[in-house]
Regions:
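ALDH superfamily catalytic-core signature
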Residues: 9, 15-173, 236, 304-305
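Short amphipathic alpha-helical segments
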Residues: 2, 22-25, 88-89, 226-227, ...
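Short intrinsically disordered, low-complexity coil segments enriched in acidic
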Residues: 1-8
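Conserved C-terminal structural/oligomerization subdomain of aldehyde/semialdehyde dehydrogenase
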Residues: 7, 153-159, 163-307
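Acidic-histidine catalytic/liganding microenvironments
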Residues: 4, 130, 206
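Phosphate-coordinating loops and pocket residues in cytosolic domains that bind phosphorylated ligands
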Residues: 3, 56, 60, 112, ...
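Short, flexible, glycine/charge-rich loop motifs used to bind or transfer phosphoryl groups or to couple energy/partner
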Residues: 1, 23, 66-67, 177-178, ...
């Protein structure tokens, strides 16, 4: 389709890797594209935010379709003020939202076996590179030790559902594969930071995200973030909701996509404004056409200041 000369406009939703291929093939015919590519969308819980309220909303956004949405929070940055009670609070809220989560029909499966195996590989890689992985096992928060088999601990065994238990990865680092690609699953790396500057530096280590989520009650820091962050869209004190506003454009920037849609922006993006001019019976062009007399030169000089 991308190479079809009859296509007027291509809209693609998917990974950045495939989006580059679509754009490359479309460029052969100069076909315009709109690319919605996802990426690594961060959430930031500031020191002025309520940890409980923020996590309730972040968990809802992350666990929708088991993290398999293009604007799911991909990793979490948390002010160190909240570190002491973070893990306990996270899993308490998770258990309230999804009782007996692995048997809960409200909690989605992973799309296919290959994707599930890839997510398990991300967890093993994170553990091998120094990450602390926490899960909820039979109502108890458990840290996965090196001797534990991650596959046995985190998936339903002997059943076809392909469910993966939500996992926190603490002490993440950029050697881990899960910090170098969109996770697209129920795995949440968590960074604890001392300042807004440290948080912003973390965000800028990754490519420009499709979404950014900021949690807090202080206006001045919020405005500073809105001024400095480069992202496709932002939701303040919640997740995902900027995407469902018909009076806001939705789309990515740089590696998270190009072009916007929704509402009037979608109509204009997918339309071509064809200019049409019909000359009247009498044309003024005769007054400025050769031969150029002194009178015509004066007229042209006058027109130069009017146009």
């Amino acid at each position: 389709i991308a190479q079809d000369k009859e296509v007027d406009h291509l809209f693609f939703t998917g990974s950045t890797r495939v989006g580059k291929e679509v754009a490359k093939y479309a460029a052969e015919n100069l076909t315009p594209t709109t690319l919605e590519l996802g990426g690594k969308s961060p959430a930031y819980i500031t020191n002025s935010a309520s940890l409980t309220k923020s996590l309730q909303r972040i968990i809802l956004g992350k666990m929708l379709n088991a993290g398999q949405t293009c604007i799911a929070p991909d990793y979490l940055i948390v002010d160190r003020k909240h570190e002491l009670n973070f893990v306990e609070t996270f899993f308490k809220i998770l258990a309230n939202l999804y009782p007996e989560i692995m048997e809960n029909s409200d909690y989605s499966a992973i799309i296919n076996k290959e994707r599930l195996e890839h997510l398990l590989q991300l967890l093993e890689d994170a553990r091998d590179k120094g990450g602390d992985i926490y899960i909820l096992s039979e109502g108890t928060v458990e840290k996965l030790q090196n001797k534990k088999n991650i596959s046995e601990m985190t998936t339903i065994s002997g059943k076809p559902e392909r469910k993966l238990t939500p996992s926190l990865v603490l002490n993440p680092n950029f050697r881990m594969n899960l910090l170098n690609e969109e996770i697209f699953g129920p795995i949440l790396p968590v960074f604890f930071v001392e300042s807004d500057t440290e948080a912003l530096n973390l965000v800028e280590k990754n490519q420009r995200p499709l979404a950014f989520y900021w949690f807090g009650d202080q206006k001045e820091p919020r405005q500073k973030w809105l001024k400095n962050i480069v992202a496709g869209g932002v939701t303040i004190n919640d997740c995902l909701l900027h995407c469902v506003q018909n009076d806001l454009p939705f789309g990515g920037v740089s590696c998270s996509g190009s072009g916007t849609y929704h509402g009037i922006w979608g109509f204009e993006n997918f339309s071509h404004r064809k200019s049409i001019f019909k000359q009247s019976r009498f044309s003024a062009m005769k007054s400025v056409s050769p031969p150029y007399t002194k009178t015509k030169y004066k007229l042209l000089r006058m027109l130069r200041f009017l146009i």
